[in-house]
Amino acid sequence: MAVLLIIIAQPYFFLMTITGTHFNYYHICHRKLWLFSNGINMEQESDLVYEGTLLHEYAYPQRNSKYEEVVIDGIKVDYYDSKNKIIHEIKKSNKIDKAHEWQLKYYLYVFEKHGISGVKGLLEYPLLRKTSEVILTDADREKIKYISDDIETIISLQSCPPLVQKGICKKCSYYEFCYTNESDI
């Protein structure tokens, strides 16, 4: 007796967990969000991303032993102070502060969703010597649900969103990809 096995393959983005990076890219550029979510990753080639990685590793060297790295639901929080319930997010520049803030709010939301309540966030810009506190409000929780749905809509598009020229494009790791031959995408 033969058994017919039917496998319905879904594109991997339906299986993808939304991460803080998705929230960050959503606020920066929908095209970057789509490219990243569809497996086109240019960060490994970017000197600017490398500089950010170095800053992250060396700005607060004492943190590696003091705070914990936490992975929940596909998000990776590098510095979590469990004693004081604070997520520390380190960024190089505050030029896209809104994107950084929503990335951190999403982390707070995921922690809360997993029963870790009362967590605060700190956005830290060591090169600017600036720190700002981030909290999650009821309005933010509602907006996160809306943004999550919008992210899923964007990443499930059959083709890449059109290029939208912005002032931050030249510092983006996808710059050459986007501006080399836009009609091929």
Mark where each language-model region is:
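Targeting/processing segments of secretory and organellar proteins
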Residues: 2-4, 9-10
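Solvent-exposed, charged helical/coil patches
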Residues: 13-64
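Structural motif
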Residues: 20-23, 99, 160-167
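Cysteine-cluster motifs in flexible loop/terminal segments that predominantly coordinate metals
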Residues: 29-33, 160-185
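Short helix-capping/linker segments at secondary-structure and domain boundaries
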Residues: 36-42, 111-118, 180-184
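Short alpha-helical "patches" and their helix-cap loops
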Residues: 42-53, 120-127, 185
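Active-site metal-binding core of divalent-cation-utilizing nuclease and nuclease-like domains
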Residues: 46-84, 102, 129-133
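Nucleic-acid nuclease catalytic cores
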Residues: 72, 81-157, 167-170, 176
